[in-house]
Amino acid sequence: MVLNGMPITMPVPMPVPMPVPSPPATKSRVAIDWDINDSKMPSVGEFDDFNDWSNGHCRLIYSVQSDEARKHASGWAMRNTNNHNVNILKKSCLGVLLCSAKCKLPNGASVHLRPAICDKARRKQQGKQCPNRNCNGRLEIQACRGHCGYPVTHFWRRDGNGIYFQAKGTHDHPRPEAKGSTEARRLLAGGRRVRSLAVMLARESALSDKLSSLRPTKRQAKTQSIQESKRRRMGASDVLETKQELVVPPTTYLPTSTPTHSTNFNQSQGSYVPAGQGSVISQWNREIHYETEDPCYANGMYSYDMLHSPLSAHSSTGSYYQENKPQQLQHSQYQQQLSPQQHVPVSYDPSQPISSSLQCGMPSYEICDDTSSLTSSSGYCSEDYGYYNGYLPNSLDVSNGSQSQNLSQDASFYTTSSEIFSVFESTLNGGGTSGVDLIYDEATAYQQHQQQGTFPHLTNYQQEPQDQMQSADYYYSNTGVDNSWNIQMDATYHPVNSTDPIYC
């Protein structure tokens, strides 16, 4: 074309790719007229070959030996449709998936994918990106309208030795890709997804292994914390035991009531001073005293100097004696071994240890009868038979070698009870004389037996005081535990001297 003397090149229109047209109608080799809805199907001896892309109005008879015919297979995307006749299977065409941009593949073919049978999956296919990498189009469905505006319909029926197929309508859309190729592509895509998933799992496993190596698990951490706290507690207990072994406890005193005779009565003073430097709160007036002298009692409530009694710790809080430590027990045993060979000293030393035979007072197997009456002494009391030395003068006390060495202190005595102070307080403080003298006949006999069997070397020291003290007509006995009194009579009482001191 020439315009104003200049040739003009006309643009050549680009060819638009057209979908592959449907094949022509399929013809059967069996020239028999029949319909799928007939009550009786004709019998034939020759069968047609299986055709995946049957198109148009056609009737085909397949052999029962054909696998594709038994599966009702077809190249077209067909789905099952409801049918009123249970003997006839009805299927309808779903069309084809095409690219909205009408793109061409490198091999010159157009994009025509097979639609999914499931409605939900088919809806997902619509609007997806075109599988062609060089195309920005979207997939869309071209529906089949080849049967009077409705999808092409296929009918399948099995009767006798043949499978009868009948199609109604002609497909107005290109062929979709074959079912086999679609499945192959899906398998390939699935393999890629599986490989990607395997890579992701491998990476996640490596990451979890690294995290596990960097930090212990929760259970391991809890176990380690429990073991650590247990080791800490054990270490603390070991340190505490070591400290307790290193610390030497101070000398402690247990309460007894061992008064010595005194002529002064003063209730305003009463304090105990332990050995060594320390402070003690008075149990009478709550005053604190700091002393460094030997343990002793000042003039107390009853104006008696308290000696260290070898008796039980359950009688009174008025006096104290030292508990036997291992060193003191060894010293006591050593003193007992030397006592038969040594002479009795003149003075009594209260700081000497107590004999191990009477270190705890009343033994655990002794029982005290708290039901004894004033007119009967039938109730057994351990002090009536075992602790006779508590009511005897110091000269008659042979329970301990170190404590039976004072022959001149006849006025002092031991007792295991403090209740006697409140009952006979006037007598102890220098009251009127009486014929009551606390001497036990059983104690005397027991003492003589012990002197002959265990302490033969003290017989000459004890004989004269015993003869002098057998002078009681009746006496009172108090167990020191139940505050009950027993009265016993002695017909052989002959007073020796009315001026002798009275002991309760």
From Swiss-Prot:
GO biological process, one term: positive regulation of glial cell differentiation
Ranges annotated as DNA-binding: 32-188
UniProt xrefs under InterPro entries: GCM, GCM_dom_sf, GCM_large, GCM_small, Tscrpt_reg_GCM
Biased segments, Polar residues type: 313-325
Biased composition (Low complexity): 326-343
Statement: the UniProt record of this protein carries the keyword rRNA-binding: no
Keywords attached to this entry: Developmental protein, DNA-binding, Nucleus, Transcription, Transcription regulation
GO cellular component: nucleus
Localization in the cell: Nucleus
Region (Disordered): 214-237, 313-357
Organs and tissues of expression: Expressed transiently in early glial cells.
Single GO MF annotation: DNA binding
Entry annotated with the keyword Ion transport: no
Spans through the membrane: none
Deletion consequences: Flies exhibit failure of glia to differentiate in the CNS and in the PNS, glia are transformed into neurons. Ectopic expression causes neurons to transform to glia.
Task of the protein: Transcription factor that induces gliogenesis. It determines the choice between glial and neuronal fates. Also has a role in the differentiation of the plasmatocyte/macrophage lineage of hemocytes.
Protein name: Transcription factor glial cells missing
Protein source organism: Drosophila melanogaster (Fruit fly)
